[in-house]
Amino acid sequence: MNLPAATALFTPSWHAELELAYARCGATTRPVLRRHLGPLRVQKHLYAEGPEVCQHIIVHPPGGIAGGDRLAISARVDSGAWAQLTSPGAAKWYRATGPASQTLNLQVAPGATLEWLPQETIVFSAAQAELTTRIELQGDARLFYWDIIALGRPASGERFEQGHFQAHLDLYRDGRPLWHERQRIGGGDGLLDSPIGLDGQPVFATLLVTGEIDSELLERCRALAHPVRGDLSQLPGLLVARCLASEALQARAWLIELWRLLRPALLGREARPPRIWNT
């Protein structure tokens, strides 16, 4: 339903929490904790790849995030378990008179694997979006994490002219930092068009994968034919991929192709895209 502008700006805020935990029981990864407060939910867990990988789809029923909304998501993957978390569609941050926030805390135990593969986040012009992500890995825990951000609504010709987008991302292994990132982009900011910023591209994406790959696979990743401006960097114990794109679908397609190449090499399993991505 489309609300008049005045109504949309003053819709009551949501405070929502979702807490998840996964454990290995024999040969099966099972959800052992699923607690929610407010409109955040997960759908029934799936085993599309067999019992070892537990897939959950996180949904936010109101359909979007507005001023005053506060979302908190935490997920813990215990030793030997494998969880894959995704979303049914784009997360939308609407224009608002005050900030909205999302806090994400992910913990992965030794021998465990977490894939965090949400669909894109669309930040409308005049939204005030503030995202904080903290990921803690222990021992040989494995991670495949991505995020896709679209500022404004490129498909509708809307530029990000007002409001702000802020994101903090921290990744640790055994308490030692692997990756720290701080972003803050204001509506109409010069960084949106600067060659040292987004260079006129409204969409940017980040991929973090634990592990290291050989030069041959790195070149195969770099040679992917896609209409994005992307590259990869191999750091000690961490592979980082970044891209700029004119559309979120382009960035997502690039990340999925990287996932198809990297998942067998770094996680030991062929990539099988969740069915929800095709709906």
Curated annotation (Swiss-Prot):
Record flagged with keyword Chaperone: yes
Transmembrane residue ranges: none
Localization: Cytoplasm
Similarity annotation: Belongs to the UreD family.
InterPro entries linked to this entry: UreD (IPR002669)
Source species of the chain: Pseudomonas fluorescens (strain ATCC BAA-477 / NRRL B-23932 / Pf-5)
Keywords in alphabetical order: Chaperone, Cytoplasm, Nickel insertion
Domain of life: Bacteria
UniProt xrefs under Pfam families: UreD
GO cellular component entries: cytoplasm
Cited HAMAP family: UreD (MF_01384)
Summary of subunit composition and partner proteins: UreD, UreF and UreG form a complex that acts as a GTP-hydrolysis-dependent molecular chaperone, activating the urease apoprotein by helping to assemble the nickel containing metallocenter of UreC. The UreE protein probably delivers the nickel.
Protein name: Urease accessory protein UreD
Entry's Gene Ontology molecular function annotations: nickel cation binding
Main location (coarse class): cytoplasm
Function per UniProt: Required for maturation of urease via the functional incorporation of the urease nickel metallocenter.
